[in-house]
UniProtKB/Swiss-Prot annotation:
Quaternary context: Consists of a catalytic RNA component (M1 or rnpB) and a protein subunit.
SUPFAM superfamilies referenced in this protein's UniProt entry, alphabetically: Ribosomal protein S5 domain 2-like
EC number(s) on file: 3.1.26.5
Biological process according to GO: tRNA 5'-leader removal
Keyword match RNA-binding: yes
Name of the protein this chain belongs to: Ribonuclease P protein component
InterPro entries reported for this sequence: Ribosomal_Su5_D2-typ_SF, Ribsml_uS5_D2-typ_fold_subgr, RNase_P, RNase_P_CS
Similarity field: Belongs to the RnpA family.
Catalyzed reaction equations: Endonucleolytic cleavage of RNA, removing 5'-extranucleotides from tRNA precursor
Pfam family, one: Ribonuclease_P
Its job: RNaseP catalyzes the removal of the 5'-leader sequence from pre-tRNA to produce the mature 5'-terminus. It can also cleave other RNA substrates such as 4.5S RNA. The protein component plays an auxiliary but essential role in vivo by binding to the 5'-leader sequence and broadening the substrate specificity of the ribozyme.
Organism from which the protein derives: Anoxybacillus flavithermus (strain DSM 21510 / WK1)
Amino acid sequence: MKKKYRIKKNEEFQEVFKRGTSVANRQFVLYVLDKPEQLYFRIGLSVSKKIGKAVVRNRVKRYIRQVFHEERDRIEIGKDYVIIARMPVATMEYEEAKKSLLHVLRRANVFH
């Protein structure tokens, strides 16, 4: 995923947290912020050290990025998405994590 599609700066994360709307399930919290002037969507990932060691955290981040990559044609543009992973996702396989993340995305109405 190209750098322009990622949220990296703390100020950008804080803006999404403050002004965005959130949807959650047991594995993920999703914050969505409208950015109508943006011609693409951006994602920011937050995986706490509570989830596990670096190997586990990096695997969870790869899972999330892969879901967004596979679903990129269906996801609405002009929005910023911040995904926070919760503890149960650490022990999940990719297909389970994908199903859970898609559930959160559907609840947030991000598919067109």
